[in-house]
Amino acid sequence: CLRNKKAQASNVRHLEEESNKMHAQRLIQEVDGKCAVVNPPYPPMTTEELDASFDLPYTRVPHPKYKGKRIPAYEMIKFSVNIHRGCFGGCAFCTISAHQGKFITCRSKESIIKEVKKVIEMPDFKGYLSDLGGPSANMYGMHGRNPKACEKCKRPSCIHPQICPNLDTDHSKLIDLYRAVDALPGIKKSFIGSGVRYDLLLHKSKDEKANQAAREYTRELI
């Protein structure tokens, strides 16, 4: 990368492109007479698999080695709940494609509610969730209408330079989730600390139901 920045950029492009595919290829690069092998990522998790990983008996507290010290990063996320995995934004500065991919896997509403109830029981919880989000705040429940098209897609982003016509941008499931969480006894207010993709909100879909849900989500957010 020091000798040839264009070659390095080309190399990274190949890595990013394969990371964003539904069915990636194995990458092999010769280095000093040997071969570096990058195996394809696992397929996106199912909702059941994601629920199982979040339903494990986590303590929600820092490692004992910190011995009660204040950890700023922990303070920021200790009353937050992750609702999905993956992001189809494709931002050039972001590495989510390398470790989560662009295909969204959502937790079930039941799994999320179960975790929120555990947060409510935390001794220093005052009723305010700091974040009900994910890699991006408002991609929950979104996917390609035609999965076969997604399987062949090589685009790094589903929304740039324009929103893919195959993308279902309906925010209805997310609105329903927010309201279910806010209705729980012990919750005074839930905040959205993750980044909101406003291009999804401003998008004019051919589906009027999705347009109405985007307007409703914007009001809910404000």
Specify the residue positions occupied by each region the protein language model found:
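Flexible, acidic/Gly-rich N-terminal and inter-domain linker regions that tether
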Residues: C1-I77
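Alpha-helix capping and helix-loop boundary segments enriched in small/acidic/polar residues
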Residues: K78, N82, F103-R107, P165-T169
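Conserved strand-turn element in the central/C-terminal portion of the radical SAM core barrel
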Residues: G90, S97-G101, G193-L201
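N-terminal pre-triad scaffold of radical SAM enzymes
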Residues: K67-T95, I113, Y128
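Iron-sulfur (Fe-S) cluster-binding segments and ferredoxin-like electron-carrier domains
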Residues: C94-S111
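Conserved SAM/AdoMet-binding glycine-rich loop
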Residues: K118-I222
